[in-house]
UniProtKB/Swiss-Prot annotation:
It comes from the Bacteria. The active site is at K164 (proton acceptor). The keyword Methyltransferase applies. S-adenosyl-L-methionine binds at G63, W65, D83, D99, D124. Specifically methylates the uridine in position 2552 of 23S rRNA at the 2'-O position of the ribose in the fully assembled 50S ribosomal subunit. It is found in: Cytoplasm. It comes from Shewanella sp. (strain MR-7). This is Ribosomal RNA large subunit methyltransferase E.
Length: 209
């Protein structure tokens, strides 16, 4: 019994230490959140963003992903970000505050995108968690479905999509829908993602619709 207690305690300590490592590293590098490391890991494996690209970042606040994206896209690139929460300005990022689920906010976002198609759609969106899977999972799936809808509206042929998805009810159906829209779809679990989290990232390339 005592051995099991020590193991559980050790696991909790390791998780907290692991989290602290990324939080401290983010602070040291001037990154706004530990989530920035997730996009960096996806970029290292899948080379999603290249100089000169146009990127849409959904669920952007506090700005960790936008910081990474604007650096990768460079001076000739463009990053358009949206979140229901406020976000301090980032040089090179066009930020729209509003609820992405509302039609008027979606229209405003599409206006900022303009007539030209975008190269990459990013979504790190997640609902406010209630602790009830029966409530949280449908909310989370609704958000990722909206992100895929955004791809259908703005993504250029052969464009890319990276989206956070929580494994659970609706995941398999969503994976099927993403595979129908893209040539290649990979499931990633970044090292910087909390081990206890059900979140994974779908990285889809070669938009074909």
């Amino acid at each position: 019994m005592s051995g099991k207690k020590r193991t559980a305690s050790s696991n909790r300590w390791m998780l907290e230490h692991f989290d602290d490592h990324y939080v401290k590293l983010a602070q040291k590098r001037g990154l706004r959140s530990r989530a920035a490391f997730k996009l960096e890991e996806l970029q290292q494996k899948d080379q999603l963003i290249r100089p000169g690209m146009t990127v849409v970042d959904l669920g952007a606040a506090p700005g960790g992903w936008s910081q990474v994206a604007v650096k990768l896209a460079g001076d000739k690139g463009k990053v358009i970000a949206c979140d229901i929460l406020p976000m301090d300005p980032i040089v090179g990022v066009d930020f729209l505050q509003g609820d992405f689920r509302e039609e008027k906010v979606l229209e405003a976002l599409l206006t900022r995108v303009g007539a030209d198609k975008v190269d990459v759609v990013l979504s790190d969106m997640a609902p406010n968690m209630s602790g009830s899977d029966g409530v949280d999972q449908p909310r989370a799936m609704y958000l990722v479905e909206l992100a895929l809808d955004m791809c259908h509206q703005v993504l250029a042929p052969n464009g890319s999509f990276a989206v956070k998805v929580f494994q659970g009810e609706g995941f398999d159906e969503y994976m099927k829908a993403v595979k129908e829209a893209f040539k290649v779809v990979k499931t990633r679990k970044p090292d910087s993602s909390r081990a206890r989290s059900r979140e994974v990232y779908l990285v889809a390339t070669g938009y074909k619709l």
